[in-house]
Structures are given as C-alpha cells and as structure tokens.
Amino acid sequence: KIVESYRKLYNIMGMNLRSVNIGCNSIARIVLADKSNMEKMPLLVCQIDKNFLGLTLFENGQMAFARYVPISEEDYDSDDYITEALNENIFRMEQFNKARGGSGLENVILYGFIEDYIKLVDALDGLDIKASVLGVPAQITGFENFEFTVFANAIGALYKRNKATEKINLLEVDQSTGKGGSSGMGSL
C-alpha cells in the first residue's frame, strides 16, 4: 500500500523514479563492521537517551528488527526510569526473538547517554545477559576528545554504504501489487 502511494505521488509530480532503497541504519554499519559481533548474535544494540530508547536486533549477520521507544520519568515509579525502561524493553526484545524461533539474547551492546555504566550493567544482571559498551571502530581517531557512544549514530552515517548488503529496492520487491522493475514515469 505504501509503495503504491509513492508510485502515485511520483506520477503526479511527473518524476521518473528508478528505485526506492531501504537499508541498514547508521548504527548497523558500525555494528556489522566489527566482525567480532557476528559471534554474539542474536545481538541487541540499545541506544540510551533521557527521552527514548533505540533498540536494534541483529540476527544471522544482519539487522532483523529495530524499534524506537519514547520514555519519560512519568511513565515509571522510579527515579531511575531509564534503567527500568531499558530492562523492560530488553525483555520484550528477547521475547520477540524467541517468538520467531530464536535462542534468546545473550549479548547487549549499549551506546548513547550512559551516566553510570556499572549501575546499568548491575541492573541488567537479572536478565542473564552480557552487556558491553559499543566499541570505537579502529578507523576512528581522535575519539579521546569526545564521548564516542554519544555520537555513534552520526559517525555511522559517515560510513560508506555497502551496496551489496544494504540495498532493498522496493520497486523490485513490490509483490503486493504485482508491479516491479524500475521503469515508468513517477512509479514507486
């Protein structure tokens, strides 16, 4: 339905649409560039912020699912609402993984706004997972001058896209309408 809506929009605009690509988000580029993460899958990568959590599940060497969860202090009966929200959402993502036939989560990588890493890891201890902080890629220099995990998404966006693994052309896979290919005026 969405693909067809874009087809109509581009047709109205009189534009020749050759492809609509979706792919990995910027943090996925950093995670997948580190080959040691392949051994940790299924792997959950969690972005922590005072207002949201970003959760990205990796399975079989690729990004499988991502969700963004707004959080606020009012939603939890605790001053430590970030830790509570993180615990709750890691548990949900583990249930999601298991519901799809997965083995459950053993490894979680954290990045973003991490005030007290030890406190956070201790709080996650009840989930029986190994938590770590997103490592700085070898090609990143000068990270001593800033907190890498806070800027990881922006840095990941600078990585060159791997066209072989990070491309899904929605025009080629639009099976719901029976339309495919990349020709035609204003098609999506």
Model-flagged regions — what are they?
Residues K1-L188:
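Hydrophobic/aromatic-enriched cytosolic interaction surfaces used to assemble or bind macromolecules
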